[in-house]
Amino acid sequence: MIISAASDYRAAAQRILPPFLFHYMDGGAYSEYTLRRNVEDLSEVALRQRILKNMSDLSLETTLFNEKLSMPVALGPVGLCGMYARRGEVQAAKAADAHGIPFTLSTVSVCPIEEVAPAIKRPMWFQLYVLRDRGFMRNALERAKAAGCSTLVFTVDMPTPGARYRDAHSGMSGPNAAMRRYLQAVTHPQWAWDVGLNGRPHDLGNISAYLGKPTGLEDYIGWLANNFDPSISWKDLEWIRDFWDGPMVIKGILDPEDARDAVRFGADGIVVSNHGGRQLDGVLSSARALPAIADAVKGDIAILADSGIRNGLDVVRMIALGADTVLLGRAFLYALATAGQAGVANLLNLIEKEMKVAMTLTGAKSISEITQDSLVQVLGKELPAALAPMAKGNAA
């Protein structure tokens, strides 16, 4: 099979993975309107082509939280990576490390902090959910600090799980789910051998270490469902800010006022995100939400963005809309499921090449030169010829 884009990895992953895993990764909340808009809205962002500029010294390097990145991309937190490839978190982290970008370990990873951190040279990032069990949160933070994690990504858009219709149909949940998953596994031999048999243990490593006993997929579904905390507020985050002495990023911002609250709280960064369309269907795509948020807090806090990014062109679009760096989710997971570390490494190379093409043809020699001036049209609205700063109304 010829691999030239993330879409090729998606097609390959669908053949390799049991349906319950593919659709858990690929699906979104409710009718998946926001999931689709994340991708479609980015595709409507038209760039301004410029020609006859000397682009021989083009550079993708950037700095974030005093870390040098080879390009403004990080691998975002994705749960259960180790169910998509053998010890998947370790493989993805190694690919990111080799490319000179951060890897973010999810709270609900298969491989625990202590397995992933020693496998790479640069400090990894760690993602934490808002959970009722504050003992687990403190334990996870202590272990992340001990392992040398540099940045905490605190996910706040999951006070309750989203309703994901695909999960019930695919076997992740619903009637006879365990039996359906077993039957799917035995009919997908490549996955069954590589991950099902040789990728064990299939624990939720970070949670198992805390509970002192093995955990599995049923524990993942049940433990998380019982531990999400809808009562959380900014005040509840103060002890985390006091405890964590490194950069702290608030993930799940879609409104400018919430972004301003993050600045007032003292966060070092935000992630403009709708959780990949997996939480509340019908909310703004990240591409639509980003310009107004950037207008409100750009320069006061680092702005990261995710949801809908599939290639290097999308990275350039997000930066032009106001992001400093982007997080990849599904795109790298498709590659991981298809070819492990090598797949993720190849995807990152593709994204880098695509970024270089986009920057060359828009006349941006550096990441700092990718601005709103790089845009001609945003979400169906043509910008003035002078390309004046985008009006706030354009973001809605």
Curated annotation (Swiss-Prot):
Residues annotated for substrate binding in this entry: 24, 129, 164, 278
CDD domains with a match to the protein in the record: alpha_hydroxyacid_oxid_FMN
Classification via PROSITE patterns: FMN_HYDROXY_ACID_DH_1, FMN_HYDROXY_ACID_DH_2
Cofactors demanded by this protein: FMN
Any one of the GO CC terms: plasma membrane
Binding annotation for FMN: 106, 127, 155, 251, 306-330
Protein location: Cell inner membrane
EC number, as in UniProt: 1.1.-.-
Catalytic activity: (S)-lactate + A = pyruvate + AH2
Membrane topology (UniProt): Peripheral membrane protein
Keywords: Cell inner membrane, Cell membrane, Flavoprotein, FMN, Membrane, Oxidoreductase
Pfam families on file: FMN_dh (PF01070)
Domain (FMN hydroxy acid dehydrogenase) ranges: 1-380
Gene3D superfamilies named among the record's database cross-references: Aldolase class I
GO molecular function terms noted in the UniProt entry: FMN binding; L-lactate dehydrogenase activity
GO terms for biological process, alphabetical: aerobic respiration; lactate metabolic process
Catalytic residues (positions): 275 (proton acceptor)
Superkingdom of origin organism: Bacteria
UniProt similarity note: Belongs to the FMN-dependent alpha-hydroxy acid dehydrogenase family.
Function comment: Catalyzes the conversion of L-lactate to pyruvate. Is coupled to the respiratory chain.
Name under which the protein is recorded: L-lactate dehydrogenase
Organism ancestry: Bacteria, Pseudomonadati, Pseudomonadota, Gammaproteobacteria, Enterobacterales
Name of the gene this protein is made from: lldD
